[in-house]
């Protein structure tokens, strides 16, 4: 293995940037080339079909079978003109990834040959095996039927010569088995509730749209180095490995010059994104070595989420062309920053108003204050649920460390917004809702630099849910996660709160109160009642943890127990009121969450035990034997005053023996703890046992392996080290 390590290190060092074929056209000319967008619909559908489809999309109405047949014919022709040979329903099962089954367009022609066919029935509905996906007990092998159905609001696309049709995925009995179905329900709920409140300010509002702009962080590792690390291959993270002498302490990687191999990968990925209609815009080095970020222009939430899932698949494919492996795990390396996926979330109306943007008039500002107060109330009431929506076995390694938001949900507003709220609560005058515009700041002694415009809020990187000027940044989501999980909880909670708010305001108006006064008083009431969630300080501090507990916020840090928030009465009732989940769906999803947590730790424990006993212990034993031989030879030559020359080697031998003893002992304990946990049938209790008994053993095993790495001869160490994984680019 040590020979393999040096071979792959040499191979990785010899890599050069792979040339990228840059299109001769501008990005705007090939953007969406492989997407059945409205421009392509207009080209391949007759006018009546096009108008009917666009109307159905804009008004969220189902397609008739006759219309579906006409759309399918045009879509098939477009797909085949662009090289597609197969089609697939593309959906998001409860695995955090995507699923697809490819079928050819061919059908018998009755003459011994085939013809290309694609009907509306095949476009609109398919029947995947529901029992083979995570389902929380809703489906069994003997009752396996499930349905996928076309989501017309997300355009079809072509990838690898396959027409992919975004779909929902439900069971034969109607329960959702995916992320898209409840996401669409939550978005419809916030649309309806938000529009009802927005019409207080503009009676022309018909819809409120949820927007999402994600920021995808990731690591790149050379393919050869990756293949020589079984833990990376099997679990997505390093289960052992001592920090390199240099990691991120010089702060020289963030926004640094992008390495040539990486820049070629980024360029290739960006071109592929644009062809698939993903508006990739920003790329840069992140904080940790070999860590990077890609961010797009924001989009409607459902489409943005589809694009993020598509991007993660694309990254793996493009990285392979550049001899990289993409690591989307939240914490692939200890001792350096992990990876997240900030979700920039906002609401806007179909008339063009952005509801989280402070306005220039009292009316606009009252609207802003109204929606701000409702978000604040929703986040406080459901802070435990929002934390559960981003919790996972992988994100557990990242949250709460001084690199990511704490495992306590709070809301940052900034000094100016806080000052306005404080003034509102101290006055009865409603025209006091005023926000200063961006102020000019001139740099001293640098006359050639133009005046800078300073935003009305600072940035608090320690806040998990921060207001950033015209949107909220939900920073706690993990890099490998499906954004839908967080967006479902957030949009549903806000929708439920807006509905309550409207009922309260309408009651005041019915009692004779002026509309503006009724709105303001209800908003002020929400600010008063939900102060506990507002925190602009250092979320990393121990003082905040104590203060958060005093405020009654959810401070649970154990992921299996965090999941309990989904089944609390206030969560269950909220999801039922908004029509997002039924009781059965919630219980099934939590079963899946606990089961996935257990399985991921189970795999990690098995891999760690194997590497410890079959890779590390043999190498440490061989090195220890070399030291023993050396000690015997020293003693055979030197005696008397020189007999102590072997003491350092003897001490090293003792330390190695101790580390090996603890490793073997803890691996045995870990195996037994796993066996005991596996006997438990209740998924929640099993997950808790893995967290409480298996995970601590893994931490001890890793600690002692990392100590051995510093002691064993570098020439003998079998696995690529952190300095090689993180600094060979």
Predicted regions and their residues:
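C-terminal amphipathic alpha-helical interaction region
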Residues: 523-729
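Short linear, low-complexity motifs centered on an aromatic residue
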Residues: 96-112, 131, 229, 236-238, ...
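N-terminal hydrophobic targeting/anchoring segments and the immediately downstream early-domain regions
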Residues: 1-24, 141-157
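Glycine-rich, acidic/polar active-site loops that bind/position phosphate-bearing ligands
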Residues: 143-328, 337-340, 347-591
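Histidine/acidic residue-rich metal-binding segments in metalloenzymes
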Residues: 12-120, 124-140
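Active-site proximal loops enriched in glycine and acidic residues that flank catalytic Cys/His/Asp
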Residues: 67, 91, 119, 296-298, ...
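Active-site-proximal loop/turn and secondary-structure-junction residues that shape catalytic pockets
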Residues: 67-71, 91-93, 121-122, 169, ...
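Composition- and surface-driven signal marking solvent-exposed, interaction-prone regions
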Residues: 308, 330-331, 357-361, 485-494, ...
């Amino acid at each position: 293995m040590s020979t393999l390590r040096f071979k792959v290190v040499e191979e990785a060092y010899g890599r050069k940037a792979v040339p990228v074929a840059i299109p001769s056209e501008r990005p705007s000319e090939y953007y969406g080339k492989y997407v059945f967008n409205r421009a392509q619909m207009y080209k391949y559908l007759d006018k009546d079909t096009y108008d009917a489809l666009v109307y159905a999309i804009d008004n969220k109405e189902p397609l008739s079978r006759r219309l579906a047949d006409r759309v399918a014919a045009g879509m098939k022709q477009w797909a085949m003109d662009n090289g597609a040979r197969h089609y697939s329903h593309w959906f998001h099962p409860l695995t955090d990834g995507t699923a697809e089954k490819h079928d050819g367009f061919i059908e018998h022609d009755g003459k011994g040959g085939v013809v290309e066919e694609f009907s509306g029935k095949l476009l609109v509905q398919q029947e995947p095996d529901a029992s083979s996906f995570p389902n929380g007990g809703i489906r069994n092998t003997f009752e396996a039927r499930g349905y996928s159905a076309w989501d017309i609001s997300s355009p079809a696309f072509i990838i690898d010569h396959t027409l992919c049709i975004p779909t929902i995925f439900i069971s034969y009995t109607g329960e959702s088995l995916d992320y898209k179905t409840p996401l669409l329900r939550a978005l419809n709920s916030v649309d309806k509730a938000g529009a009802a409140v927005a019409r207080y300010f503009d009676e022309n509002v018909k819809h409120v749209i949820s927007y999402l702009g994600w920021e995808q962080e990731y690591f790149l590792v050379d393919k050869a180095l990756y293949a020589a690390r079984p833990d990376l291959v099997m679990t997505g993270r390093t289960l052992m490995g001592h920090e390199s002498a240099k990691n991120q302490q010089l702060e020289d990687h963030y926004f640094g010059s992008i390495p040539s191999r990486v820049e070629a990968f980024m360029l290739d990925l960006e071109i592929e994104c644009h062809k698939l209609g993903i508006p990739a815009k920003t790329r840069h080095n992140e904080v940790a070595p070999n860590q990077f970020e890609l961010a797009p222009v924001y989009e409607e939430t459902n489409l943005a989420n589809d694009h993020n899932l598509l991007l993660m698949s694309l990254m793996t494919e493009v990285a392979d062309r550049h001899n990289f492996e993409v690591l989307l795990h939240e914490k692939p390396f200890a001792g350096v920053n992990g990876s997240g996926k900030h979700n920039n979330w906002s609401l806007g109306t179909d008339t063009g108003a952005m509801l989280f943007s402070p306005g220039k008039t009292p009316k606009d500002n009252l609207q802003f204050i109204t929606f701000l107060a409702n978000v604040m109330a929703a986040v406080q009431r459901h802070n435990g649920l929002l934390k559960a929506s981003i919790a996972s076995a992988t994100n557990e390694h990242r949250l709460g460390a001084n690199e990511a938001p704490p495992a306590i949900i709070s809301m940052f507003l900034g000094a100016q917004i806080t000052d306005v709220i404080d003034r509102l609560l101290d006055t009865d005058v409603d025209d006091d809702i005023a926000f200063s515009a961006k102020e000019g700041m001139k740099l001293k002694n640098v006359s050639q630099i133009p005046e800078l415009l300073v935003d009305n809020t600072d940035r608090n990187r320690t806040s998990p849910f921060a207001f950033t000027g015209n949107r909220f940044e939900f920073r706690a989501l993990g890099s490998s996660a499906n954004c839908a999980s967080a967006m479902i909880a957030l949009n549903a909670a806000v929708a439920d709160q807006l509905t309550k708010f409207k009922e309260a305001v309408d009651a005041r108006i019915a009692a004779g109160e002026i509309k503006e006064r009724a709105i303001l008083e209800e908003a002020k009431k929400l600010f008063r009642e939900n102060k506990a969630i507002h925190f602009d300080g250092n979320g990393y501090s121990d003082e905040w943890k104590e203060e958060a507990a005093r405020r009654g916020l959810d401070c649970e840090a154990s992921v299996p127990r965090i999941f309990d928030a989904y089944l609390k009465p206030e969560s269950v009732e909220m999801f039922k009121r908004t029509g997002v989940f039924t009781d059965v769906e919630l219980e099934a999803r939590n079963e899946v969450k606990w089961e996935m947590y257990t399985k991921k730790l189970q795999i990690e424990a098995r891999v760690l035990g194997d590497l410890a006993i079959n890779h590390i212990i043999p190498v440490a034993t061989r090195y220890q034997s070399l030291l023993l031989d050396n000690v015997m030879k020293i003693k055979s030559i030197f005696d008397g005053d020189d007999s102590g020359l072997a003491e350092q080697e003897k001490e090293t031998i003792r330390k190695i023996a101790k580390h090996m003893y603890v490793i073997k002992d803890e691996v045995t304990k870990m195996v037994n703890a796993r066996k005991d946990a596996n006997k438990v049938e209740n998924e929640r209790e099993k997950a808790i046992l893995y967290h409480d008994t298996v995970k601590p053993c893994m931490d001890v095993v890793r600690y002692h392996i990392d100590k051995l790495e510093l002691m064993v001869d570098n020439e003998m160490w079998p696995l690529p080290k952190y300095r090689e994984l993180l600094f060979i680019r």
